[in-house]
From Swiss-Prot:
Gene name tied to this protein: queF
GO CC terms: cytoplasm
Annotated organism of origin: Acinetobacter baylyi (strain ATCC 33305 / BD413 / ADP1)
A Pfam family that the UniProt record links to this protein: QueF_N
GO molecular function, one term: preQ1 synthase activity
The name this protein goes by in its record: NADPH-dependent 7-cyano-7-deazaguanine reductase
HAMAP family the record matches: QueF_type2
PANTHER family, A to Z: NADPH-DEPENDENT 7-CYANO-7-DEAZAGUANINE REDUCTASE
Active site as annotated: 178 (thioimide intermediate), 185 (proton donor)
Localization: Cytoplasm
One GO biological process term: queuosine biosynthetic process
Length: 271
């Protein structure tokens, strides 16, 4: 099925009974074809936070929690976000004898949709703390050149620095558009690398160039990862984006060249 057949951007009735059939998988293959030779492009995880998660206990009393879904980047499919929202809404009036029963059912349904092992972790509503970003913020730098669409030629090494570096950079200025609805997506992107020192102004210019780009969160992160890997040739690389929520969900894709560089998932203030 193509994304045009999904419920994104369409008026939809919200199910009030358990409805796993609403889940809409989207193949990762088409977006990855041009990155087939990029090391690590399918290595990492997609973390989703579910803020509108509710069900009934055995006494028919509503329960609430925050959920964290972990979807491996190796999965053949990602799950379209509106369908995931509808799926979780369909659980609002479903009775579960325990939290574990809920977890087991959700993991089964999402794993089937993604054709890979998906996990769910539950948090009390006041226990998922907000973290502060770590690393060097590059948002106050002045780019030499600005473009309105992603342009890998913006990426440059630092001509004045020959020594290798192990650096984590981040920017709050990531913006792209949903490819179906055209709605803006906002995020913070973290870039960690080892190798020849990058020109940080060029990286900021490259991030800003996504502001009119149409792409799903996961696809944007993989394009950023691929362009840095190809153009700047780091020894190791991590790209991790924490997007703001929409419809009670936020999406946080991470791609790494080395699994030892997988960060712990975080929640930032804008989420």
């Amino acid at each position: 099925m193509s994304v045009e057949q999904s419920l994104l951007g369409k008026e939809t009735e919200y199910p009030t009974t358990y409805s796993p059939s609403v889940l809409f998988p989207i193949s990762r293959d088409a977006a990855r074809e041009k990155y087939a030779q990029i090391e690590g492009i399918s290595q990492g995880k997609d973390w989703w936070h579910v803020f509108e998660l509710s069900w009934l206990n055995s006494d028919n009393i509503p329960q609430v929690a925050i959920g964290r879904i972990t979807l491996p980047a190796t999965s053949p499919y990602l799950i379209e976000s509106k369908s995931l929202k509808l799926y979780f809404n369909s659980l609002n009036f479903h009775v579960f004898a325990s939290k574990q029963e809920l977890i087991d059912l959700v993991e089964k349904d999402l794993s089937q949709a993604a054709n890979a092992k998906v996990s769910l972790e539950l948090f009390d509503v006041d226990s998922l703390e907000i973290s502060k970003p770590s690393g060097m913020c590059i948002d106050d730098l002045k780019p030499e050149r600005l473009e309105s669409h992603p342009d890998a030629s913006l990426l440059k090494l630092d001509a004045n620095e020959q020594h290798d570096a192990d650096v984590t950079l981040y920017s709050h200025l990531l913006r792209s558009n949903c490819p179906v609805t055209g709605q803006p997506d906002w995020g913070t992107v973290f870039i960690r690398y080892t190798g020849r020192k990058h020109c940080y102004r060029s990286i900021l210019a490259y991030i800003i160039s996504y502001r009119q780009h149409n792409g799903f969160h996961e696809q944007c992160v993989e394009q950023i990862y691929a362009d840095i890997w190809k153009n700047l040739q780091p020894e190791k690389l991590m790209v991790y984006a924490t997007y703001t929520r929409r419809g009670g969900l936020d999406i946080n894709p991470c791609r790494v060249s080395d699994l030892s560089w997988m960060p712990n998932p975080i929640r930032l203030a804008r989420q």
